[in-house]
Amino acid sequence: MSEAYRQPVLGVIGGSGVYDIDGLEGARWQTVESPFGDVSDQILRGTLDGLEMAFLPRHGRGHVLAPSDVNYRANIDALKRAGVTEILSVSAVGSLAEDLPPGTFVIADQFIDRTFAREKSFFRQGSGRPCQHGPSGQRLAGRSRRRGSGRSGHSPSPGRHLSVHGGAAVLDPGRKQSLSAMGLPRHRHDQHARGQAGPRSRDRLLHRGHGHRFRLLAPRSRPRQRRGGGSRAAAKRR
């Protein structure tokens, strides 16, 4: 069947605390194998409001896999083999931004990958797959905006309003979200994020997605003031 006429199948990867999806009709667990190794768990298939879905718990049911033990390539490959056409990855987060309270959703529309010590490509030598480069930034940004950036609605929690924001993500390895000192060097990344995503980099977030830390960064609203008055840029000119 042509890709243009394929029935869309939404794949959802659940993070910590998200091990299934309530309300799925015809729910059934399906085993899918991958040549990239062990998949985190079986895939839960079903339909929700007429949309076919496939759910995969990133850490396995019962949270049996540490972030460093998750085979991310195998998970993505298994969802593709299950017929998934698009993937939504959900993760629990801790915010570093005062204007992002609990209950806020952030959909990253740009990212800067600073991770290491993990396989990142499906096209290593000997894979037998044709490898070609394609632009990802515009594609990611466009899909993210269409999928909900700037939207709002009602949260399942009584009395809580659900807001959705966009932003640029910086991916770093590690799990340090509970360290208060992690908030100290944020200014060092602000200018870098501004060059990547412009004014859309308005949110800061510490995100434990895919075993790595995500920080959504915002450019400063005004130049930092030096002692004695004047900005740093003005001081350099003097």
From Swiss-Prot:
What biological process terms from GO does the record include?
L-methionine salvage from methylthioadenosine; nucleoside metabolic process
Q: Name the family.
A: Belongs to the PNP/MTAP phosphorylase family.
Listed Gene3D superfamilies: Nucleoside phosphorylase domain (3.40.50.1580)
Q: Has the keyword Glycosyltransferase been applied to this entry?
A: yes
Q: Which organism is it from?
A: Rhodospirillum rubrum
GO molecular function terms attached to this record = S-methyl-5-thioadenosine phosphorylase activity
Show the stretches that span the lipid bilayer.
Answer: none
What protein name is recorded for this chain? Uncharacterized 25.8 kDa protein in petC 3'region
